[in-house]
Amino acid sequence: MASKEEIIAKAKDAITDFDEELAAEVAEEALAAGIDPVELIEKGFTAGMQEVGEQFEQGSLFLPHVLAAAEAMNTGMEVIKPEMEKRKSETKSLGTVVIGTIEGDIHSIGKDIVASMLNIAGFKVVDLGRDVPIKTFVEKAKEVKPQIIASSALMTTTMVNQIQIEEQLKEAGIRDQVKTMVGGAPVTQDWADKIGADLYGESATDVVSKVRAVLL
């Protein structure tokens, strides 16, 4: 029987090799071996996605490769999901996070990974999807009263819209009732500080650890 390290390494390989079948197999193998699904995702699937993302930024991989890697990860996650849902039903929600990719931006891979990781970590996630109008973030904040609103921007031309979330939350009179978090490829801590966001998420694991720190 393969060791935990070998199974996690295979999970990473499944993503970097764009192998959906292997992703499903290794997810089943991990569950059978009693490996913590969160560890499998963080050290296997997410690590693989980060490697693919880096190669994409360097120009050695292209968008179809990134999409294929994301599909492989989604396939593996589907296998793990029932176990995660079972765990969630046994523990109360740790808090609510509204998340979405900002208006004008159709990219959702990074946001999808973050949403999955938060879900797995025990938070209730309200995923608004991609190309989300600013007013939708605000309306959803009024409706579900989350602790955190997280927006992702994958382009410099759309990250400016993150300023509007801050402004419109103030106009709605609810800015002081919620923490805001920003992330995405062009987004930095300096940008978060400049626009007045409470938190900056550099990676999926960074987001989870910072959300935990704020809410727990």
From Swiss-Prot:
One MF annotation (Gene Ontology) recorded for this entry: cobalt ion binding
PROSITE patterns assigned: B12_BINDING, B12_BINDING_NTER
S-S bonds: none
Residue ranges constituting the B12-binding N-terminal domain according to the UniProt record: 1-92
Keyword Repeat attributed: yes
Residue stretches making up the B12-binding domain: 94-216
Residues involved in methylcob(III)alamin binding: 107
Keywords: Cobalt, Metal-binding, Methanogenesis, Repeat
GO biological process: methanogenesis
Alphabetical list of InterPro entries matching this protein: Cbl-bd_cap, Cobalamin-bd, Cobalamin-bd_sf, Corrinoid_p, Met_Synthase/Corrinoid, Meth_synthase_dom
Pfam families per UniProt: B12-binding, B12-binding_2
SMART domains to which the protein is assigned, alphabetical: B12-binding_2
Pathway: One-carbon metabolism; methanogenesis from trimethylamine
NCBIfam families linked to this entry: pyl_corrinoid
Membership in a protein family: Belongs to the methylamine corrinoid protein family.
Quaternary structure and interacting proteins, as annotated: Can form a complex with MttB.
Described function: Acts probably as a methyl group carrier between MttB and either MtbA or MtaA.
Protein name: Trimethylamine corrinoid protein 1
Organism this protein belongs to: Methanosarcina acetivorans (strain ATCC 35395 / DSM 2834 / JCM 12185 / C2A)
Lineage, opening ranks: Archaea, Methanobacteriati, Methanobacteriota, Stenosarchaea group, Methanomicrobia
